[in-house]
Amino acid sequence: MVLQDPKYSLDPVMPIGAQIAETLQAHRPCHAAQARRQVHDALAAVGIEDPARVMRLYPHEVSGGMGQRAMIAMMLIAGPELLIADEPTSALDVTVQLQVLGILDKLVADRGMGLIFISHDLRLVSSFCDRVLVMYAGRVVEEIAAVDLHNAQHPYTRGLLNCLPQLGAPRHPLPTLDRQPEWAA
């Protein structure tokens, strides 16, 4: 699982390489030299240009984008069939966000694994995902193809979509949802 902010997900007193190696050893024990090579390769696979240097750094010594790439490397080194990414780009600026999404997309496609992408950013979801499940009060209230998200029917989904800002459109107060108890049923 790739979490929202690497600053809170990575151990601050352990070098990044050691954290990734620990994950590898927990799932597929191997000799230390082999683990170092695999950690190096995992960091390179997520677009880190100098993996050997980054392996020695502590989380506070890297940028948010590099920390998130390290988190992705840590999650992928165990060879999962499914990756859960919970708001993996929300703590990143837009440029880095797109880079991280590109890395995730490539790795998921190359490895043939599934991805559950959790996000409140409906624009991002509609451009990055195949299918969308909209949840309200812990329950799925709508399932729709991402390309059809703009045609969603559930009042909660419509309310979320109506809150998205439109470039060039006049500003207006955000609509208030008239929440119904049956939405959560």
Question: Over which residues does each language-model region extend?
Answer:
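Helical segment within the ABC ATPase nucleotide-binding domain
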Residues: L98-R111, R123
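Short catalytic/signature loops enriched in Gly
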Residues: E49-M55, E143-A185
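A short, proline-enriched helix->beta-strand linker immediately N-terminal to the Walker B motif
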Residues: I77-E81
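A short, surface-exposed alpha-helical micro-motif characterized by mixed small hydrophobic
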Residues: V125-S127
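H-loop/switch region of ABC-family ATPase nucleotide-binding domains
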Residues: S119-H120
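Hydrophobic anchor residue at the start of the ABC signature
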Residues: I20, I72, L83, V96, ...
